[in-house]
UniProtKB/Swiss-Prot annotation:
Protein's name according to its UniProt entry: ATP synthase subunit delta
The gene coding this protein: atpH
Subunit structure: F-type ATPases have 2 components, F(1) - the catalytic core - and F(0) - the membrane proton channel. F(1) has five subunits: alpha(3), beta(3), gamma(1), delta(1), epsilon(1). F(0) has three main subunits: a(1), b(2) and c(10-14). The alpha and beta chains form an alternating ring which encloses part of the gamma chain. F(1) is attached to F(0) by a central stalk formed by the gamma and epsilon chains, while a peripheral stalk is formed by the delta and b chains.
GO cellular component: plasma membrane; proton-transporting ATP synthase complex
Keyword Membrane attributed: yes
Family: Belongs to the ATPase delta chain family.
Classification via InterPro entries: ATP_synth_OSCP/delta_N_sf (IPR026015), ATPase_OSCP/dsu (IPR000711)
Protein's membrane topology: Peripheral membrane protein
PANTHER family named among the record's database cross-references: ATP SYNTHASE DELTA CHAIN (PTHR11910)
Subcellular location: Cell inner membrane
Pfam families (alphabetical): OSCP (PF00213)
Keyword Transport tagged: yes
Keywords annotated in UniProt: ATP synthesis, Cell inner membrane, Cell membrane, CF(1), Hydrogen ion transport, Ion transport, Membrane, Transport
Amino acid sequence: MKASYFLASKYAQALLGTLEEKGEISRLDEYVEAFQRLKKALESSESLRDMVYSPLIPPKHIVSRMKDVSEFDDTIFVQFLEVLADKRRQNLIPFMSHILYQESLEREKVVEVRLVLPNEVSNTIINQVKQAIQNKTGRKIKLRTQFNEDLIGGLQLYIGDKFFDYSVKGFLQDIQSAYAPIGGGEIFES
């Protein structure tokens, strides 16, 4: 069966509901980390992926292997893996990992921000950008910085699923698209 983000969200909501019902929602980060370890292992190991997704291997063996890989021996987690394996829904794990991670950020009122700069800058400047975003959003910021020399100057921000381009490269591309020849082609051809 093909993996579906919609179906994965239903399973993730069921897990969240169970955690809330059992009073274990405060341990959500542990579950997120376990799913992320499992996802990473499935992406990096073809033999593990073949074994976990195989319809021929008994679900109990699949659950045992997933539990070992996730390094998380929790009753609710193992029971949830058993449900996934019994229904042959192991292929939803990568989507569920992402959904649970986003839910964890939302519950902690944290926004994940990726800051792309043309070159290295001081921590003071990075902290100023972080503080400005935190003031605008009213949330804690989980900031990751990257460097891309192609930007020439300025910066690019990825805040959640939104993209803000304040780079020289982006400005030049805007100019080019605004003044591009009607027949297409590059305005700055050599």
